[in-house]
Each structure stands twice: as C-alpha cells, then as structure tokens.
C-alpha cells in the first residue's frame, strides 16, 4: 500500500484537498492500494511549533512520501537542511496542486518515490524541473512527459 501525506502549514487548503482526494479514492475503489492523510508539515517531523497543536511527535514513519503545498518551499528547505526529514518530500507544482485528481497524485507520489529510491536527495525534484513550484503542468510529471512526445 502506498501511504501519502498531504502537507501544508495550517491545514486550510490541504485538509480540504485531502478530503476531496479521499472521496476520489473511494469512488475509484482504490482504498486498498493507497492511504492518504492530511498532516500539517510541522507535525510531520515533530517541529517545535507543533507544541501549539499538542502533536509534538514525528509522524514520518506513518507515510512513504509527503507531498507539500507549494508555499512550503522555504519551510521544507529549512527542515531538510536541519536533518529533520528522513522520507521523500516533494513540493507540488502550483497548477497541479489546484487541479489535482487522485490518479495524477498517485502517479506523482510513485515517481517521487522512485527518484528517492534511486538516490535523488530531498527536496525531491524531477530532473527537468529543478524547482517544481515553477512548473506549469496540470497533470502528473509522467503524463506531462507522455503528452510532450
């Protein structure tokens, strides 16, 4: 089973997105293949700011990959540079984040895991997208490459 965390700062947009994606999982009968959960980014790695919410514990072992809202770029870099992250994290491209459907999200997570397993360091990026926040695509990287051919 692929376990995916959807992360943002306060949870306003990503918790709604995670709920929407979980409905898609159920509608497509994918619950046995994919587990998707919203986890605020600070709670993912037990950052001190998580004391505010009372959830100061590292939750990285609960998921295989964390897909982050685009606005977390600098927070993610700080956490990686501090050595606090031991799972692959990926910043979703802005347009994909806004229009994401479950199939694109699953493909993105699978491909990020493959890159990570092949030695790509955090923050994981695709070779042709060194800064994913700048990507203009609205589909998974896999589909975007296929459409470009």
Listing of model-derived features with the role each one plays in the protein:
Residues 87-142:
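Ser/Thr/Gly-rich flexible loops in soluble cytosolic domains mediating phosphotransfer, phosphorylation
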Residues 64-103:
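Mid-chain, well-packed structural core segment of small domains
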Residues 1-3, 88-89:
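Glycine-rich, often proline-containing surface loops adjacent to acidic residues and nearby aromatics
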